[in-house]
């Protein structure tokens, strides 16, 4: 192990084609001499980013030869892929914070009969309080939610909120206000059919452009953001296997951290960060407020969760 550490240190010092690990990944050391120990006492090789793939040899939570079935800590999305964890975060998963699942469903492409991905939407556990702070605010309640005149005694604020979140005109306003609050979200995209990294990148870009608000945004900023998205995929090429995971973390400033988990290899790859906030905001607003969202089932469950948190 000492010899391996020396080799990793030497590799990590190469500057050509290498990038420093993002700050949000601080709970995993990028210095080979600081390999941490997992619960079983086995060493975890630290992460190398950039053109080198980042491999984490951590405790496996799945059977290599079988799809992980739902249990008390996970929920089924589709029989072709592993169940989605109800909670995801460090130390098992190298994310910036702990996340909780608030919506899941199947994402279809081109035809309702072609199931492409399982989609999960997660919220940062520390940020759940922002839902009520934003959606129960006096301004939004009076202007967009509790607008019946005279007020109906039969409908509660939660009833009115559910109606507003299903309204094509009001939903984008409410969701954009929630995103502006700094709430952290994460999407988990798990291929039901094998695909490619190019498809993942193109699909993310198309989802951004499907948001009608994208048409009124600064084109230069959008193009700069799409270039950052493209740069995140420079280090990975080829096929994406069924049941692998593509993660998009939405930060407080609406920048996005992109990462990929190769399940059979047990490799976690940090793809990079899209700093332009327009991309992250447009993408997650499309997930949560679109008339034709990537997964209507996931959006419905997210609405139910937001109502219950308000």
Swiss-Prot record:
Instruction: Report the main location listed first in the record.
Output: mitochondrion
Query: Which Pfam families does the record associate with it?
Result: Chalcone_2
Q: Where in the cell is it found?
A: Mitochondrion
Keyword annotations for this protein?
Mitochondrion, Transit peptide
Q: Which SUPFAM superfamilies does the protein's record reference?
A: Chalcone isomerase
Query: Entry's InterPro entries?
Result: Chalcone_isomerase (IPR016087), Chalcone_isomerase_3-sand (IPR016088), Chalcone_isomerase_sf (IPR036298)
Transit peptide residues? 1-20
Tell me the domain of life. Eukaryota
Renumbered to this chain, the signal peptide range is none
Could you state a single Gene Ontology molecular function term? intramolecular lyase activity
Q: Which family does it belong to?
A: Belongs to the AIM18/AIM46 family.
Name under which the protein is recorded: Altered inheritance of mitochondria protein 46, mitochondrial
> Upper taxonomic classification of the species?
Eukaryota, Fungi, Dikarya, Ascomycota, Saccharomycotina
């Amino acid at each position: 192990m000492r010899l391996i550490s020396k080799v990793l240190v030497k590799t990590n010092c190469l500057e050509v084609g290498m990038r420093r690990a993002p700050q949000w990944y601080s709970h995993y050391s990028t210095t080979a001499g600081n390999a941490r120990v997992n619960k079983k006492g086995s060493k975890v090789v630290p992460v190398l980013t950039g053109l080198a793939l980042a491999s984490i040899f951590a405790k496996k939570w799945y059977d290599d030869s079988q799809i992980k079935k739902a249990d008390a800590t996970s929920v089924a999305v589709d029989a072709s892929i592993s169940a989605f964890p109800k909670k995801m975060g460090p130390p098992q998963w190298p994310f910036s914070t702990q996340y909780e699942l608030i919506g899941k469903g199947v994402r279809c492409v081109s035809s309702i009969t072609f199931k492409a991905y399982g989609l999960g939407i997660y919220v940062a556990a520390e940020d759940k309080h922002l839902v009520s702070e934003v959606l129960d605010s006096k301004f939004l309640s009076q202007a967009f939610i509790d607008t019946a005149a005279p007020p109906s005694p039969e409908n509660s604020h939660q009833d009115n909120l559910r109606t507003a979140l299903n309204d094509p005109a009001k939903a984008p306003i409410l969701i954009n206000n929630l995103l502006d609050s700094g709430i952290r979200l994460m999407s988990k995209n798990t291929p039901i059919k094998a695909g490619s990294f190019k498809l993942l990148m193109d699909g993310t870009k198309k989802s951004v452009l499907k948001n009608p608000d994208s048409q009124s945004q600064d084109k230069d900023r959008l193009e700069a953001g799409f270039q950052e998205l493209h740069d995140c995929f420079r280090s990975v090429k080829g096929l994406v296997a069924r049941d692998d995971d593509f993660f998009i973390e939405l930060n407080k400033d609406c920048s996005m951290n992109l990462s990929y988990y190769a399940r059979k290899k047990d490799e976690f790859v940090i793809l990079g960060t899209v700093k332009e906030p327009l991309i992250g905001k447009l993408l997650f607003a499309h997930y949560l407020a679109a008339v034709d969202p990537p997964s209507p089932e996931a959006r419905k469950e997210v609405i139910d969760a937001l109502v219950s948190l308000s």
